[in-house]
Amino acid sequence: MAAKGAREKIRLVSSAETGHFYTTDKNKRNMPEKMEIKKFDPVVRKHVIYKEAKIK
C-alpha cells in the first residue's frame, strides 16, 4: 500500500473580511509555513492578501 501524499487541501481566506475564499492544495514538506498570497477579491474588486486557513 502506498504512503499518504504530502499535499494537503487548504482554504485561502480574504484579509478584506468579505467572506470570499479560494481553495487549493500545498505540499507541506516544501512549504511548512502558512501561505500568504495576493489574489483578486471580486467582492471588493481589488487585489488583497489571502491567508491560509484549514478546511472545516
Curated annotation (Swiss-Prot):
The keyword Zinc appears for this protein: no
The answer, when asked if Ribonucleoprotein is one of the entry's keywords, is yes
Q: Which GO terms describe its cellular component?
A: cytosolic large ribosomal subunit
One matching Pfam family is: Ribosomal_L33
Q: Which SUPFAM superfamilies match?
A: Zn-binding ribosomal proteins
The leader peptide range reads: none
Extract one GO molecular function annotation from the record.
Answer: structural constituent of ribosome
Query: Which keywords describe this protein according to UniProt?
Result: Ribonucleoprotein, Ribosomal protein
GO terms in the biological process aspect are: translation
What does the similarity note say? Belongs to the bacterial ribosomal protein bL33 family.
NCBIfam families xref list: PRK00595.1 (NF001860), rpmG_bact (TIGR01023)
**What protein is this chain from?**
Large ribosomal subunit protein bL33
Source species: Mannheimia succiniciproducens (strain KCTC 0769BP / MBEL55E)
